[in-house]
């Protein structure tokens, strides 16, 4: 069977990184653990969210659920009190929004994570945190610009940045707003860390569902899962004929979804008032991996990367799809469905896995 890797994601496979993250062992010869290092949830409005880490780890993962209301925010990520809204020139970044030409800034005071937006956002970042090297950041975020409506597709940003400081590790992660709005009560930043030399600890990611088909079907259903604020999903489609993966939450097939996606680095396509999130890049075998912000009382935002096999064999390059999806329903997700929109079937070997934490 051809092995598929997701586009613009760390290497993940059925028994790979997600299995590692949800594992119960540690150490160089065993499984690694992404552990929670710290979090901050606002209880009022603020221009800054800062998280002090319980310990420094060489690999960091940052998840953000931001609530902003009707006024714009424009975030800058910075580390160890170096930067924020000025006073530092130790950062450089590149950001691309909605398929437009990327912009760059050098010798500045923080990493641009958002561009100006309002309402709600879900974001995640991976950061290398080695003392002897500049700290490199890669992140993806999705913004919901129309609260309560599926008639507007989410916007998105791709961010890469660096903090040039060497000789120490990141021990504080923060973001500050330089626009007119504020981060509202309920906004949250969570920082996870991984050290391959750890031998004890508990993974923050809990397996919520693991479903593998044994026959033909048009749906892979997680069944009821525990209500968690942060969800990480992975699916593989073993296709017979023209079968393609799309997504629903809580078996809701009403027109409550909207999607922004870009295939193979092309321009963005948007879909509004749909009965599913449009994940498929091509019909046929495909592998997808992504994160969902499942914040209570907020619309649900998905960031997904899918790789499609295309024609089997090394003579054809795989297809890549990046997806930003939204459900306008604010009820929390307690089940996930991968649904087929083609004339073929999902067949035996197709699977869906879900992890989560609060």
Question: Which residues make up each language-model segment?
Answer:
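N-terminal glycine-rich anion-binding loops that anchor highly charged ligand groups
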Residues: 11
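Surface-exposed molecular-recognition determinants
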Residues: 14-15, 22-358
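Sec-dependent, cleavable N-terminal signal peptides
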Residues: 1-2
């Amino acid at each position: 069977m051809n092995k598929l890797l997701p586009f613009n994601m760390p290497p993940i496979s059925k028994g790979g990184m997600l299995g590692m993250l949800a594992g119960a062992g540690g150490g160089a010869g065993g499984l690694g653990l992404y552990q929670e290092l710290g979090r901050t949830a606002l209880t009022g409005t603020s221009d800054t969210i800062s998280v002090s880490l319980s310990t420094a780890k060489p690999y960091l993962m940052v998840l953000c659920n931001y609530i902003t209301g009707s006024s714009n925010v424009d975030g800058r990520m910075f580390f160890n009190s170096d930067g924020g809204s000025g006073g530092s020139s130790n950062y450089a970044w590149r950001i691309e929004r909605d398929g437009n030409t990327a912009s760059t800034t050098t010798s500045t005071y923080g990493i641009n994570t958002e561009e100006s937006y309002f309402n709600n956002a879900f974001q995640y970042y991976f950061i290398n945190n080695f003392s002897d090297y500049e700290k490199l950041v890669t992140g993806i975020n999705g913004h919901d610009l129309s609260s309560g409506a599926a008639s507007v597709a989410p916007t998105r940003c791709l961010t890469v940045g660096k903090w040039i400081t060497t000789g120490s590790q990141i021990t504080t992660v923060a973001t500050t707003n330089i626009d007119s709005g504020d981060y509202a009560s309920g906004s949250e930043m969570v920082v996870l860390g991984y050290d391959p030399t750890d031998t004890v600890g508990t993974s923050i990611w809990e397996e919520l569902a693991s479903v593998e088909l044994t026959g033909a079907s048009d749906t892979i259903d997680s069944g009821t899962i525990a209500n968690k604020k942060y969800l990480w999903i992975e699916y593989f489609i073993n296709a017979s004929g023209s079968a393609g993966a799309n997504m629903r939450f809580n078996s809701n097939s009403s027109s409550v979804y909207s999607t922004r996606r870009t295939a193979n680095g092309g321009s963005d396509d948007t879909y509004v008032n749909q009965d599913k999130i449009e994940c498929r890049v091509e019909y046929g075998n495909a592998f997808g991996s992504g994160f969902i912000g499942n914040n209570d009382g907020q619309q649900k935002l998905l960031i997904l990367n899918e790789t499609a096999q295309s024609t089997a064999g090394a003579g054809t390059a795989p297809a890549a799809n990046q997806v930003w999806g939204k459900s306008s329903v604010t009820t929390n997700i307690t089940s996930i469905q991968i649904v087929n929109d083609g004339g073929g079937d999902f067949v035996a070997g197709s699977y869906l896995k879900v992890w989560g934490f609060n």
